[in-house]
């Protein structure tokens, strides 16, 4: 299942998230499948994990969980930002965990490309990159993020990695 929500956060929060992407601490060493030498590297910034104090990004997760029924039964174990420039197409992959939420924080023109593609059964679905769009899906759906088609633009997506809350495992209201 894939759920797409437009204009998800209020404009002030959307703008704050977008401005924040300018100061992320990027590393250039991530792959969709680290064991696959043919997969392209791209940029990653670790925004929050279960072992770090709750922060702004965790607060965003709490808003998402409250407003997106598909992920209401989940807890978040990691939040990262993915960064891609021209030439850094993602590779088809599935995610770790049970469900994933992607958020597109930056202003974006359609001609810049950067769509996310999903493969379900034998069909491909394109979800265009659009600022303040949120995409939630089950992590076993194969997908990839395409790179920008123009130079000097960083495509940023924020990925919330989720697991289904098993009885007694996590407090869903946390």
Tell me what each language-model feature is:
Residues 54-174:
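Catalytic core of non-heme Fe(II) oxygenases with the double-stranded beta-helix
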Residues 1-74, 80:
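Non-heme Fe(II)/2-oxoglutarate
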